[in-house]
Amino acid sequence: MLFGKHPFTVVPNGIDTARFAARDPQRRALLRGELGVTDQEILFGHVGRFSDQKNHPGLLKIFAAVRTRLSKARLVLLGGGDPAYVEKMQALAAELGLGDSVIFAGVRSNIQSFYDAMDAFLQPSLFEGLPVVLVEAQTAGLPCFVAETVDRGAAFTDRVKFLPLNDTAAWANTIAAASFRRDPQAREKAIKAGYDIHTSA
């Protein structure tokens, strides 16, 4: 064991739960309008640096399969990275026939506003520890569809579905059958799980 017989304390990565749980219909409508997303469309989101670990190729293939079942689905990708890699993902999106259904939003400082604008969160990472973005998305009350490679200890709401990394059909079928209702008690659950920065630090 890392610490042997010595006592230790695990301190979760805390976030400002009030900030991420705040709902603002006007802010949601404004941001969706800026993105060109209508009220009738389902906006999926992903937050993460463009890198091999985050598995953007797999994410785009999953979303392409989702689009065959949910024609009004849109996807917003938040994060930076190597411009050449981003361009490669843009080319893949075009190759998959996704057109303007995928929004490459780049690096943003108002991430909490984007969680408010989303209807669901996707994270098909090749490997992860305990991703803070998943804590943020859950605190926002979002349904989260996550690869089985992610630590199950990261889930503290019943809105998290763990799915096999390489089974695109399983992802698409599960997502298409899902209810996109937010969890109204998400912040309380985040605090209870120890993720509030004011109590975990």
Describe the predicted segments one by one:
Residues 134, 139, 143-147, 152:
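Short hydrophobic beta-strand element within catalytic cores of glycosyltransferases
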Residues 42, 46-65, 75, 84-88:
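A conserved mid-protein helix/loop that constitutes part of the nucleotide-sugar donor-binding site
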Residues 182-201:
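A charged, aromatic-enriched C-terminal amphipathic alpha-helix characteristic of glycosyltransferases
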Residues 14:
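Carbohydrate-associated surface elements
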Residues 21-37, 91:
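A short helix/loop element that forms part of the nucleotide-sugar donor recognition site in Leloir-type
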Residues 107, 126:
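Aromatic "clamp/platform" in nucleotide-sugar-dependent glycosyltransferases that forms part
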Residues 87-106:
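Nucleotide-activated donor-binding/catalytic signature segment of Leloir-type glycosyltransferases, i.e.
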